């Protein structure tokens, strides 16, 4: 099993591992055997920062999970939509798949779409966005980012793509824009950088 990365889904955390003041819904989620999602935060050795997802945006909880408790790990790129769906977000996933596959980079759905595909739990609704992760180990030009964004903006719902660089995550929409610096999110927090692939700048 590889080291957990942001947006990976992990199974194996139990209600007993929750803080004593955790809400009842969080206990129910873990008791039902649902996964947690890896988030960006620093942890002590042997632990990983994760988030629990309940019903609606109000039910979110950030906690830590022991690496030794992980029983299953699923990355976004392992998830793909199957068949037709009444939800615009899943329709969008099917429509953009050929465009993203043509990039030659690893990618996959995150957020509600990824969670529903992985668990079968119905969390999507008519206004759901499609969140995607695109792994970009090497720099993507801003012209290429604009081209990709243009090809995705004709989908039936809003699509938010995060580019995962070696230093952290940035929004495709920002990288395709005109601002000289963009917001890079990492385990150390968020900061504005000019080159999100420059590890020295991102660590400064």
UniProtKB/Swiss-Prot annotation:
Q: Where does the record place the catalytic residues?
A: 129, 131
- What does the UniProt keyword field contain? Nucleotidyltransferase, Transferase
Q: Which EC number(s) does UniProt give?
A: 2.7.7.66
* GO molecular function term, any single one: nucleotidyltransferase activity
The answer to whether UniProt assigns keyword Nucleotidyltransferase to this entry is yes
This protein's record includes keyword Flavoprotein = no
Under the heading InterPro entries, the entry gives: Holo-ACP_synthase (IPR017557), MdcG_C (IPR049180), MdcG_N (IPR048903)
Quote the NCBIfam families the UniProt record gives: malonate_mdcG, PRK01293.1
Which family, according to UniProt?
Belongs to the MdcG family.
Give a short account of what the protein does: Transfers 2'-(5-triphosphoribosyl)-3'-dephosphocoenzyme-A to the apo-[acyl-carrier-protein] of the malonate decarboxylase to yield holo-[acyl-carrier-protein].
What protein name applies here? Phosphoribosyl-dephospho-CoA transferase
| Lineage, top ranks | Bacteria, Pseudomonadati, Pseudomonadota, Gammaproteobacteria, Pseudomonadales
Which gene is transcribed and translated to give this protein?
A: mdcG
